[in-house]
């Protein structure tokens, strides 16, 4: 029922299946108890030979994933720093001041808008998860609870900012961090962005970078919330189709490699970075089917190696505890078939996840507690591998007691 036969970008119906990770539960829908059923959906990646977009074969209804969301950006110091830096960079680049108006799509708890508000910039967030929109509003960040592709959400943006008056203030900047992969209604979102932007305003997005995923084999970044896996090549084709232009691209380190892309309706001065990215993508082979088939073969090999490594640790009688329960943990553990027989429990810093179970593999999630001190495990498997160094440094006492910190990529 949820099968997507045509390309989300160009409508081409001749898509090629390049990676299949089997049936997997929704990555962030943690279970409250043992009796709760898992909802499984195919996790399969298709490549469009026409516009080179890489996308999931199935679309899970958005309400199942985003209405109540357990991922709070501000839980992680690394992300706080990232968004503070982003706010500083974009303030400088666009000369933002108290006369500027910035709208952030998928604003979570207001982590990016908060530093802008402190500088006096007028801000408004749009967040589909009720719990996060409430959190942001409680913290003084005006936030509309809704989906940006919906007309009624757009109508409310003016109201929130202008104290109940429907004076439409045009935005100088609209941002979307790690959102552009998360929607099946990209054309509608983009049209709405340019509806509320000033003519010379810019749309800035951050997305995980497909080239990094392929190069570093970070297949665990593939999950149902991410409908699309972007490159500058595929984004460029998508925006061109809407009469828009990419004016600049920057590489950033979040989520195992991402890109920050600047889009405008006028062909403002296009920076050399755009051509440079397109050139390196062509050299890597992002426009060739074989590149993706090769990725799939490497992922299968990685699975073989990782599963046998975990098995040999268990055969030696070693205990293993997981650290971090990001979405990628659901993907990798379900694909590998590593469950609570191998991993006793998962430690997690985000309190909203404590007492829940990782879906599919049903591994219990808990906070750092006495159990770690009284009975430290032989191995700590860092599932939030993009924070490996940060997690290891924060748990020096465990390292000193002989705990070995490992990842599934070692």
Predicted regions and their residues:
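Short, glycine-/aromatic-enriched active-site segment of Class I SAM-dependent methyltransferases
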Residues: 205-228, 232-234, 239
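A short glycine-rich, Lys/Arg-flanked "PGG" loop and its adjoining helix->strand segment in the class I
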Residues: 187-202
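A conserved beta-strand element that flanks and buttresses the S-adenosyl-L-methionine
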Residues: 172-175
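Conserved class I S-adenosyl-L-methionine
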Residues: 98-108, 320-323
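Flexible, glycine-/basic-rich loop-and-beta segments that form/coincide
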Residues: 255-299
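Conserved SAM-binding loop of SAM-dependent methyltransferases across substrates and taxa
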Residues: 109-120
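Conserved beta-strand signature within the Rossmann-like core of class I S-adenosyl-L-methionine
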Residues: 200-208, 404-407
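N-terminal juxtadomain amphipathic helix
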Residues: 1-78, 250
């Amino acid at each position: 029922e949820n099968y997507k036969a045509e390309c989300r970008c160009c409508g081409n119906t001749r898509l090629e299946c390049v990676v299949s990770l089997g049936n997997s539960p929704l990555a962030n829908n943690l279970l409250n108890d043992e009796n709760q059923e898992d909802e499984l959906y195919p996790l399969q990646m298709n490549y469009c030979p026409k516009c080179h977009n890489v996308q999931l074969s199935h679309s899970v209804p958005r309400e199942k994933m985003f209405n109540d969301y357990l991922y709070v950006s501000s839980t992680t110091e690394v992300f706080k720093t990232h968004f503070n830096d982003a706010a500083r960079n974009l303030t400088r680049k666009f000369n933002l001041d108290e006369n500027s108006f910035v709208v952030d799509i998928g604003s979570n708890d207001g982590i990016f808008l908060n530093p802008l508000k402190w500088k006096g910039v007028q801000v408004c967030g749009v967040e589909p998860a009720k719990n996060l929109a409430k959190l942001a509003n409680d913290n003084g960040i005006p936030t509309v609870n809704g989906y940006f592709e919906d007309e009624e959400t757009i109508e409310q943006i003016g109201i929130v900012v202008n104290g109940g008056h429907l004076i439409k203030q045009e935005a100088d900047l609209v941002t979307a961090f790690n959102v552009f992969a998360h929607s099946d209604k990209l054309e509608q979102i983009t049209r709405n962005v340019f509806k509320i932007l000033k003519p010379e305003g810019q749309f800035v997005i951050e997305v995980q970078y497909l080239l990094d995923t392929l190069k570093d084999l970070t297949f665990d970044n593939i999950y149902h919330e991410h409908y699309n896996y972007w490159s500058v090549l595929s984004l460029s084709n998508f925006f061109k189709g809407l009469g828009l232009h990419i004016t600049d691209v920057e590489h950033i380190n979040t989520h195992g490699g991402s890109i920050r892309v600047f889009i405008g309706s006028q062909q403002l001065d296009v920076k050399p970075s755009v051509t440079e990215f397109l050139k390196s993508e062509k050299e890597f082979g992002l426009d060739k089917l074989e590149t993706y088939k090769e990725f799939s073969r490497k992922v299968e090999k990685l699975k073989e190696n990782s599963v046998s490594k975990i098995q040999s640790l268990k055969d030696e009688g070693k205990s293993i505890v997981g650290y971090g329960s990001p979405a990628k943990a659901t993907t990798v553990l379900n694909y590998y078939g590593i469950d609570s027989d191998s991993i006793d429990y998962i430690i997690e810093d985000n309190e909203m996840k404590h007492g829940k179970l990782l879906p599919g593999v049903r591994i219990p999630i808990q906070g750092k507690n006495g159990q770690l001190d009284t009975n430290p495990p032989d191995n700590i498997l860092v599932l939030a591998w993009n924070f490996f160094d940060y997690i290891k440094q924060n748990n020096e006492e465990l390292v000193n007691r002989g705990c070995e910190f490992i990842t599934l990529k070692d």
